[in-house]
């Protein structure tokens, strides 16, 4: 089945494509690469493009989308584009200007989904990760329920079709869901999710509240300087590799297919054209229920993206069980 057709309904009536293209790349990757990679992704069949202000490449991704609309490959309504509100803009008066800046960079009139990237607020300003002289994060104190009300206003104004969150734990989701006067529920919670961190408790909770779980770092995580270098490489896992041989697929495809069959929307991040084309093949086969159980058994609650620089803040999400 092709990736354009497989969509999941959100609790506000809109639909999200089950497989998305992740646009994040480490700083050392030239920004121009985002243009080519996004074009390749759209050519390969990706229609769900996951962006963020934090990635500093929304202009480039926007150029790619614009060029694929201009050359007739897609129409705007074929594309599901996500952007994210960064931690420097969680004060309610900063939410709409942040979204408007992303729209300007993306050259779009609206995004399909706008999400709160991280529940910890840091000092507003141009610097993504403001630090004091000791190298500690400069936090801000923000009422996330007020931030959410500003997100709701963005949806009502037509700047985004849907609104959601990312990196929220159960307690933080409940805080939004139980907010007096809640107008729009979050449609999704985008979190790190892969066979080593399968998020089964959070997934069950989200399903019970009609919130879609979206998986980032679904293939483990690239060897970045801020990732613990001693952590095991997911795609080299012997069980995953044996299963890949059995299905005549790559370990990456097994990891992506695993999420699709659990009802998780999954992001595949690659700037390599061959792998981009390969990742859309996640729709071309099915894992047996026995093999799904085997993959469930790989869980070891291993989080690659700990974002420990935020750990001193009361809203740091990863201290709770889930």
From Swiss-Prot:
Keyword Oxidoreductase appears in the UniProt entry: yes
Similarity remark: Belongs to the aldo/keto reductase family.
Induction section of the entry: Detected at low levels in preovulatory follicles. Up-regulated in preovulatory follicles during luteinization 12 to 36 hours after stimulation with human chorionic gonadotropin. Up-regulated in granulosa cells 12 to 39 hours after stimulation with human chorionic gonadotropin. Detected at low levels in corpora lutea. Detected at constant low levels in theca interna.
InterPro entries: AKR, AKR1C, Aldo/ket_reductase_CS, NADP_OxRdtase_dom, NADP_OxRdtase_dom_sf
Ranges annotated as spanning the membrane: none
Principal location class: cytoplasm
Tissues in which the UniProt entry reports expression: Detected in follicle granulosa cells (at protein level). Detected in heart, lung, liver, kidney, stomach, uterus, testis, skeletal muscle and granulosa cells of the follicle wall.
UniProt xrefs under SUPFAM superfamilies: NAD(P)-linked oxidoreductase
Binding positions (substrate): 31, 117
EC number: 1.1.1.-
Organism, as annotated: Equus caballus (Horse)
Residue sites binding NADP(+) per the record: 20-24, 50, 166-167, 190, 216-221, 269-279
Protein name as it appears in the record: Aldo-keto reductase family 1 member C23
One of the protein's GO biological processes: steroid metabolic process
Gene Ontology molecular-function annotations: oxidoreductase activity
């Amino acid at each position: 089945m092709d990736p354009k057709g497989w969509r999941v309904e959100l609790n506000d009536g809109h639909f999200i494509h089950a497989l998305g293209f992740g646009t994040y790349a480490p700083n050392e990757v030239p920004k121009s690469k985002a243009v080519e990679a996004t074009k390749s992704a759209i050519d390969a069949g990706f229609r769900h493009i996951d962006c963020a202000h934090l990635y500093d490449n929304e202009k480039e991704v926007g150029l790619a989308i614009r060029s694929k609309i201009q050359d007739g490959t897609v129409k705007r309504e074929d594309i599901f584009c996500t952007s994210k509100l960064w931690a420097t803009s969680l004060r309610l008066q900063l939410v709409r200007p942040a979204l408007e800046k992303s729209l300007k960079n993306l050259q779009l009139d609206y995004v399909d989904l706008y999400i709160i990237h991280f529940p910890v607020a840091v000092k507003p300003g141009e610097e993504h990760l403001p630090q004091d002289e000791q190298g500690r994060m400069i936090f801000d104190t923000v009422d996330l329920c007020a931030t959410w009300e500003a997100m709701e206003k963005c949806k009502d104004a037509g700047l985004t079709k849907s609104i959601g969150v990312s990196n929220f734990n159960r307690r933080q989701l409940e805080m939004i869901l139980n907010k007096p006067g809640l107008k729009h529920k979050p449609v999704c919670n985008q979190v790190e999710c892969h066979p080593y961190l399968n998020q089964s408790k959070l997934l069950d909770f989200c399903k019970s509240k009609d919130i879609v779980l979206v998986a980032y770092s679904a293939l483990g995580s690239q060897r970045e300087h801020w990732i613990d270098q001693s952590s095991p490489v997911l795609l080299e896992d012997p069980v995953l590799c044996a299963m890949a041989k059995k299905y005549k697929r790559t370990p990456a495809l097994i990891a992506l297919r695993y999420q699709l069959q659990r009802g998780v929307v999954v992001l595949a991040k690659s700037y390599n054209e061959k792998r981009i084309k390969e990742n859309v093949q996640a729709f071309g086969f099915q894992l047996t229920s026995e093999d799904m159980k085997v993959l469930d058994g790989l869980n070891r609650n291993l989080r690659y993206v700990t974002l420990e620089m935020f750990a001193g803040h009361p809203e740091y999400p990863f201290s709770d069980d889930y």
